[in-house]
């Protein structure tokens, strides 16, 4: 089953601590800001959208597009990852769809695709004014988390926060 394969892959990724092999988004953005690059933020755009976004940006052969995967701050909430500077555009459509209580598949998924399309169009428009545009996100998200029936109890004395997205461990 796909869910079992995904869970196994995630477990292996966590066990090997692969997260720490990625550069921090903060460091990458600091370098880009020094060189005057236009930064375009997308709230809640996870890595699962890279294929579609890359295709939309490069399908006409006019844009040189490279992908660099980085890590955000833990916990992966907007509050912990608000690194946008004044004047940097922020697209919130994906986050709005994900947090909408009437999320229905496939309608909400199709709306998310439309948001990614609008992100690509906006990035292409920005490229008419800037030589380089970096598209980045504060965090990703997954419907898998909220639709899974499997629940994991936090360790003793841990306090679950952000509707169970993460837990703060005790001081001992």
Where are these regions (language model features)?
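Feature captures the catalytic ectodomains and active-site-proximal regions of enzymes
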Residues: 1-172
